Amino acid sequence: MTQFASPVLHSLLDTDAYKLHMQQAVFHHYYDVHVAAEFRCRGDDLLGIYADAIREQIQAMQHLRLQDDEYQWLSALPFFKADYLNWLREFRFNPEQVTVSNDNGKLDIRLSGPWREVILWEVPLLAVISEMVHRYRSPQADVAQALDTLESKLVDFSALTAGLDMSRFHLMDFGTRRRFSREVQETIVKRLQQESWFVGTSNYDLARRLSLTPMGTQAHEWFQAHQQISPDLANSQRAALAAWLEEYPDQLGIALTDCITMDAFLRDFGVEFASRYQGLRHDSGDPVEWGEKAIAHYKKLGIDPQSKTLVFSDNLDLRKAVELYRHFSSRVQLSFGIGTRLTCDIPQVKPLNIVIKLVECNGKPVAKLSDSPGKTICHDKAFVRALRKAFDLPHIKKAS
């Protein structure tokens, strides 16, 4: 490998917790399901010039494996089963599942294969892309600058929260996928550990090494895949919610609400689901409007909102988190997941707005119709129309 291309990743656990949580559920319920996913850059960055360097990193990823101490640590967690962990010990990334190309300056990446394997590519691959691009673009930037920025933010945060009861404020690191570098994320998390309101990280490797609580449940792909797994499209979201409870009947109970808009989600989120799930996660649309809808829904079902948790994770920074905390903290339990604004906040460094999203399940289209129109992803306009009809949604403006 060249100097710039020393391996970004050093652990199979350098990923978001929900990837392993979903992978276990797929392993037990949908072992033979096949999927395809695609990379998207939501900004105007032309990243195609990094295709060769990224391809080199992908080849290096096949050497990652679950180490014995990592296996032992996962085994001590309450929600992993022995059959899955034994399978995970043998898991290796297969670079043949990934195609990378430079399409007139645009970076094109497509993943395809068994869902149980493909599911693990997304987060580490995005972290690789982010770190490789920043290595080339911002070689002068370093950990000290990231830490200085955080310290300045924490001073502002202290002033902002002076006199405020912060006993119900809980912050999590969600910064793996778009971090400046692995080193920056670890440094930021170590500093945040000193704060009483910092409760954990979505990164399993950091959680293990820093004795933190790993955070995460499921992502959009869980709901998207059920659009083709479920025989009835209109029932697919309920099928996804029910299958999750089969795998995790009394833990990991935060449900993501915006795969097919919050309104469609709440229509499916009846009293049984609302009682059994511990709470909801916001990832698109207006957060105050969303939170008010969630609280009203719980009340309508006769459930005390104080017994539930709302997790906010959409484009948050510390200031936004405090605003939401002021608005909601007396009525519901709260957690805040901050990603890019913690792990890629360095002067003169432009964070990447990059995602990898499911586009097919068993050879058929799937879609994400979130509460932010710009986040909609699907190639097949006919399927988008069918999905909107099945969930009684108004006409879509544009799928991107």
From Swiss-Prot:
Known catalytic reactions: nicotinate + 5-phospho-alpha-D-ribose 1-diphosphate + ATP + H2O = nicotinate beta-D-ribonucleotide + ADP + phosphate + diphosphate
Known InterPro entries for this protein? Answer: N/Namide_PRibTrfase, NAPRTase_N, Nic_PRibTrfase, Nic_PRibTrfase-Fam, Nicotinate_pribotase-like_C
Q: What EC number(s) has UniProt assigned to this enzyme?
A: 6.3.4.21
**Which residues are recorded with the post-translational modification Phosphohistidine?**
H220
Pathway(s) of this molecule: Cofactor biosynthesis; NAD(+) biosynthesis; nicotinate D-ribonucleotide from nicotinate: step 1/1
Going by the UniProt record, its keywords in alphabetical order are: Ligase, Phosphoprotein, Pyridine nucleotide biosynthesis
Q: Which GO terms describe its cellular component?
A: cytosol
Which Gene Ontology BP annotations are present? Answer: NAD biosynthetic process via the salvage pathway
Q: What modifications does the entry list under PTM / processing?
A: Transiently phosphorylated on a His residue during the reaction cycle. Phosphorylation strongly increases the affinity for substrates and increases the rate of nicotinate D-ribonucleotide production. Dephosphorylation regenerates the low-affinity form of the enzyme, leading to product release.
Going by the entry's taxonomy, the superkingdom of the source organism is recorded as Bacteria
Q: Which GO terms describe its molecular function?
A: nicotinate phosphoribosyltransferase activity
Family affiliation: Belongs to the NAPRTase family.
Q: What does this protein do?
A: Catalyzes the synthesis of beta-nicotinate D-ribonucleotide from nicotinate and 5-phospho-D-ribose 1-phosphate at the expense of ATP.
Write the protein's name.
Answer: Nicotinate phosphoribosyltransferase
Q: Which organism is it from?
A: Shigella boydii serotype 18 (strain CDC 3083-94 / BS512)
